[in-house]
């Protein structure tokens, strides 16, 4: 919910969030959809 809200609210936040998720092994969320996580 947090990620989806941030993405819908501010695309700029998607970048830092994506990088953090990448380290967590959740790159699918950044590339395709949040549900992929």
UniProtKB/Swiss-Prot annotation:
Chain positions listed as propeptide in the UniProt record: 1-2
Stretches that traverse the bilayer: none
Name of the coding gene: sst
Keywords, ordered alphabetically: Cleavage on pair of basic residues, Disulfide bond, Hormone, Secreted
BP-aspect Gene Ontology terms: regulation of cell migration
Organism phylogeny: Eukaryota, Metazoa, Chordata, Craniata, Vertebrata
Cited function: Somatostatin inhibits the release of somatotropin.
Residue pairs linked by disulfide bridges in the UniProt entry: 26-37
Family as reported in the entry's similarity comment: Belongs to the somatostatin family.
CC terms in the record's Gene Ontology section: extracellular space
Cell compartments where the protein resides: Secreted
GO molecular function, one term: hormone activity
Protein name per UniProt: Somatostatin-37
Superkingdom classification of source: Eukaryota
